[in-house]
């Protein structure tokens, strides 16, 4: 079975378009919502992102970053083909057909290991930023919303969060027991 759309309990729909050929065959590359708006989902491969980073470094006169052209086929989370969503464009709006944005609605940057690094809005403003553990792929150690302080995370030896630290306010600690997790705030 192939997912071709969704309908919520209010009858609102999303219809998915999948790529028929090429390196993104079978991947969702377009969405139409119930209002008839059409969105293009821009996907990239790890090899494309690595080459783009190398070209940017060359253009800036810097040494190219050491970014692999592929990611490990399998991670603790399952298979990873290296394909990531890089941008979402509004391509058709029946209410405003002549007033489509000249930039993507949202854009995503990824780390060399395929982790989400940043989210940008349509003005190009960074709205979110993520930092990951160098030793453990996919383990987020910090994130920040635009205009807010960075939230940091600490983990125990089994990979469970033990502390969420906000330097400007409310922080949390997590204690794990057999059938219970106790969360304590800094107040």
Locate predicted features.
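Extended charged/polar low-complexity repeat regions
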Residues: 1-187
């Amino acid at each position: 079975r192939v997912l071709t759309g969704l309908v919520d309990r209010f009858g609102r729909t999303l219809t998915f378009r999948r790529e028929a050929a090429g390196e993104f065959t079978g991947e969702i590359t377009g969405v139409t919502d119930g209002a008839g708006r059409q969105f293009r989902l821009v996907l990239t491969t790890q090899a494309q992102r690595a080459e783009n980073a190398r070209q940017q470094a060359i253009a800036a006169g810097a040494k190219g970053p050491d970014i692999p052209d592929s990611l490990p086929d399998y991670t603790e989370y399952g298979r990873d083909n290296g394909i990531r969503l890089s941008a979402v464009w509004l391509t058709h709006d029946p209410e405003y057909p002549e007033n489509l944005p000249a930039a993507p609605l949202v854009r995503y940057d990824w780390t060399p290991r395929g982790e989400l690094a940043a989210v940008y809005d349509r003005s190009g403003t960074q709205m979110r930023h993520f930092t990951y553990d160098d030793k453990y792929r996919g383990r987020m150690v910090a994130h920040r919303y635009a205009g807010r302080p960075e939230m940091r995370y600490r983990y125990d030896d089994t990979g469970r969060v033990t502390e969420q630290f906000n330097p400007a306010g409310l922080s949390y600690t997590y204690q794990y027991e057999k059938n219970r997790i106790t969360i304590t705030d800094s107040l």
